[in-house]
Amino acid sequence: MLTLTWSGAALAQSASAGAEIYEENCATCHGERLRPTGAAPDLKKLTADRKDFFEKMVNDGKGQMPAWGGVIADEQREAIWAYIRSRAG
């Protein structure tokens, strides 16, 4: 079994990259710096155990959420997740 772990520096770098990707692609609906202003869900409320749900929603979309699977690379999606988790509270 292979287990990958993130060092603190790598996670911070990923979260920083994720912040940029988020602001370019997600902030219109989910709010700048994860502060929602409309009907879109508050992503800060996504708990760590909801990563599979997050991935499915980003890749496949649902309702008002468009599918980003062919637009955002897996690494970019992971960076967005790191950013969301770094801001969760």
Where are these regions (language model features)?
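Gly/Gly-Pro-rich "capping" loops immediately C-terminal to redox-active cysteine motifs
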Residues: 15-19, 23, 31-62
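Axial heme c-ligation environment in periplasmic c-type cytochrome domains
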Residues: 37-46, 59-89
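Electrostatic cytochrome c docking/interface patches
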Residues: 2-21, 50, 88-89
